[in-house]
């Protein structure tokens, strides 16, 4: 199950990567 982190990563990396989100198709996604 993937959850949107309400952040995009088109120009900058995901700040939410600190809590486990990753960049997928220009969106920050959290996948368990």
Curated annotation (Swiss-Prot):
It holds the Pfam family Cyclotide. Keywords: Disulfide bond, Knottin, Plant defense, Pyrrolidone carboxylic acid. GO terms for biological process: defense response. The modification Pyrrolidone carboxylic acid is found at residue 1. The keyword Transport does not apply. The presence of a 'disulfide through disulfide knot' structurally defines this protein as a knottin. This is Acyclotide phyb-M. It comes from Petunia hybrida (Petunia).
């Amino acid at each position: 199950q993937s959850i949107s982190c309400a952040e995009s990563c088109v120009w900058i990396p995901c700040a939410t990567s600190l809590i486990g989100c990753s960049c997928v198709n220009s969106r920050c996604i959290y996948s368990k």
